[in-house]
Amino acid sequence: LLVLRYQIKKICKTIMKKNNPNLSDEQKLILFDEGTEPPGSSELNNEKREGSYHCANCGVKLFDSKTKYESGSGWPSFYESLPDVFETKTDHLIGYARTEYHCKNCDAHHGHIFEDGPQPTGKRYCNNGICLVFKLKI
């Protein structure tokens, strides 16, 4: 059953990658090929308004603006996500283990979780800004 679930997710991911007309080539590279945008390149680094952050691919709400903070990393950072919106896996791409997180709804890659964030969680969700859509609270 787990193998079947994995295969279905993989097929859906491939379909979304090829057919989502709302995504740029750069977004597709990061969301589906686990790329990384250059640090400091996202306008969301400077976003201070109240609102929420959503997956650029499927629109699921991932973060509340109240959990965003300036980490100094060059990427939009949050100390907490909304409950049950991400799945994680271990990434060894750069020579050591990191925890990578993906949207649970569409399997799109967003970034990595580090254990150097502020309280109350001590976590830093280091997110590629290009993978997020900010929605202003009305």
Language-model segments: residues:
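A short Gly-Trp-Pro
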Residues: 15-138
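N-terminal amphipathic/basic-hydrophobic helices that include classical n-h-c signal peptides
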Residues: 1-15
